[in-house]
């Protein structure tokens, strides 16, 4: 098994970071083309990345402003059963330490290596959105 882990600070409080990482509206600002679902334990999320990429995930951890996790239930075979999540910790008065993970990959294959890079890019876009209010159109995100 292989995992992707990123840890970084965002200059805003945990409630805003949690909203960006755990709600369909928040995810659409930095990761998905569109998302649907109820942000609650056991709910199903629909994650859309274009016509050939309509994926699904189940919320397996939901602790407001603290932690969130999705288990992929319909996705690329390498992503099936993997878990995407974050743990948040206040850092100072107006910052949040984010521990992001995408765990349970079958191996550190080519897709895993590409996804490591893509997650870093997407998380950077999320941080820019939260800290500066910048919104990057979906089609331009991997070039931002």
Predicted regions and their residues:
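Short, highly charged C-terminal tails/helix-capping segments
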Residues: 128-144
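Hydrophobic/aromatic beta-strand elements that line small-molecule binding cavities or substrate pockets
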Residues: 8, 56-61, 82-90
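Intrinsic-disorder/low-complexity, polar/charged segments enriched in Ser/Thr/Lys/Arg/Asp/Glu/Gln
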Residues: 3-7, 44, 54, 67, ...
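Hydrophobic pocket/interface hotspot
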Residues: 17-21, 27, 45, 59, ...
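Glycine-rich portal/gate segments that line the openings of hydrophobic small-molecule binding cavities
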Residues: 28-29, 34-74
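Glycine-centered tight beta-turn/hairpin loop motif at sheet-sheet or coil-to-beta transitions
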Residues: 1, 50-52, 77-79
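Beta-strand/loop substructures that line and gate deep hydrophobic ligand-binding cavities in soluble
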Residues: 75-123, 137-139
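Hydrophobic ligand-binding cavity/cleft-lining segments
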Residues: 1-36
């Amino acid at each position: 098994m292989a995992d992707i882990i990123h840890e970084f600070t965002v200059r805003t409080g945990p409630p805003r970071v949690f909203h960006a990482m755990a709600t369909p509206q928040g995810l659409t600002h930095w990761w998905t083309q569109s998302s649907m679902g109820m942000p609650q334990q056991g709910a199903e999320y629909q994650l859309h990345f274009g016509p050939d990429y309509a994926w699904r995930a189940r919320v397996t951890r939901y602790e407001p402003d603290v932690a969130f996790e999705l288990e992929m239930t319909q996705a690329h075979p390498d992503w099936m059963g993997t878990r995407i999540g974050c743990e948040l910790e206040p850092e100072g008065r107006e910052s949040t330490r984010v521990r992001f993970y995408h765990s349970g990959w079958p191996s550190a294959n080519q897709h895993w290596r590409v996804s490591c890079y893509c997650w870093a890019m997407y998380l950077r876009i999320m941080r820019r959105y939260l800290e500066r209010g910048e919104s990057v159109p979906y089609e331009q995100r991997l070039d931002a």
